[in-house]
Amino acid sequence: MTAKSMEELVALCKRRGFIFQANEIYGGLQGLYDYGPLGVELKNNLKASWWSSMVYERDDVEGIDASILTSQDVLGQSGHEDTFSDPLIDCKDCKARWREDEIKGKNCPSCGSPNLTEPRPFNLMFKTSLGPIDDGSSFAYLRPETAQNIFTNFKNVLDSSPHHLPFGIAQIGKAFRNEITPRNFIFRVREFEQMELEFFVQKGSDDEWHKKWTDLRVQWWLDQGINEDNIELLYVTGNELAHYSKATVDIMYKFPHGLEELEGIANRTDFDLGSHTKFQEDLNINSTVKQNTKSKSRLAIQDKNNNWEIPYVIEPSAGVDRGVLAVLNEAYREEIVDNGKKRVVLSFKPHLAPIKAAVIPLKRNDENLVETASKLKLELQKTKLGRVILENTGNIGKSYRKH
């Protein structure tokens, strides 16, 4: 069983301390959310599960944690300055703004007016000035994805942790997109976290690795408690493919608001390393890339014959927040108790559960029992099990159900 509506999940998340509207006491900020005591535990556990499967359980992946502020050179060379945009439409009457794909028919969803502007590109990246003088000459972007920092660190990682193909670089971190219309709770927001792996392979083996990573990623979501019946694979084709992609498979999930992307696995070919490398003309780059005159590193690897080649890249990219939403939805249960009342129960996989253990004395006014419970809690905490709590309400049944 899953939640019947997004409203049920939103109400539960606020009531139980999972997720709150950001800056709520001042009216809130659209598209921004804060994780509460239980939410941050669930989120951290999901990230830890991903990191374990991608890095700790493999011999061919290294991890990094790169800066959020990203130079114009990086995002200009990658194509983000030119192409990282959504088509924007304005209503001439009520002044509301919409993504083109949100306009059903020819009328404004807000006021019903047919007086709409033609779609125009709206760049989704946030800018910020660097240094004490804000004259527009020195600025950086808040990164719109974690991937580019991985590509620009390709040589650093190889020099410090040598690998042969295939190998990968993983990262979990914040990204920012100035969404035109954030919506559906934490599904589409302006500040979010990504879990991304860039897996470098030899050209010619990329199709095989793309299939392999798609299978691995589907299985990982099943291991997090996602019901297989709630997952579909979407094979992106034609004009829907990103400019850098040879092939993309989206893992689609049945969220309360509908079937939407949970994770994408893209074959990015040699576009990214080819965009950021120096000596482009010597490297037989297959993708169409911008000429690079500023890069100081050759982002390539030598083959068996000592010839330089640029690896192809397979990228599994998942949103942490979307993952939290999917896991919450799957965990949602409604039960009818003895008095006929409905209660909501969350049934998480043990490794994701926000609370790992609860110590509950049978009697709240028994000093010896409470003291023993407190000592037991301390011993459990020393095991680094995770979040351990002491619940001393005296109502054993209610406390047991709560945790």
Model-predicted regions and their roles:
Residues 1-403:
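NTP/phosphate- and nucleic-acid-binding module
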